[in-house]
Amino acid sequence: MGTHFHYRPFVRLGWVIMLLAVSASATAAQSKQAGPNAQDWRAIRHTIRRQIDAFQRDDAKTAFSYAAPSVRRQFRTPHEFLSMVRTGYSAVYRPRAFRFLDPFTVSGHVIQALEVVTQDDMVMTAYYIMERQSNGTWKIAACTLEASAARSV
């Protein structure tokens, strides 16, 4: 995990919160659309679950298909994307277990949190920033991992 932001889809939580706060006024002016409803949250969870399933099968093409357009432009190919996740984000690449936590929004940004147990039994929280596409589907725009002091039992 880097400590600086270079348009990376996976960044530290502090950077995510700072960027969301800075963009709050632009977001408010840009969209008056209602927040996600129960059906949206189910679709968001489905998207995240399917991407993690694809990571576990090393299915780069499918995993990449759940990434938002900005992420796809940055990594250009499914294999570049999978390589980045494999080397830097093993918690979501090969989780031992995960469970969805309560979702929330910050300044209009939709965030789904997951509690993730890593292969070495560390507990982490993954924050997925989701982006609604023009066709109504949800894509993953960013993810950040936050370590927990807890260990899995």
What is each model feature region?
Residues 26-31, 68-74, 129-132:
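Charged, low-complexity, helix/coiled-coil-prone segments
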Residues 24-25, 59, 126:
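Generic detector of short, well-ordered, non-transmembrane alpha-helical segments enriched
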Residues 2-55, 108, 139-140:
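Juxtamembrane and targeting peptides
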Residues 102-153:
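Exposed beta-sheet edge and beta->alpha loop/turn motif
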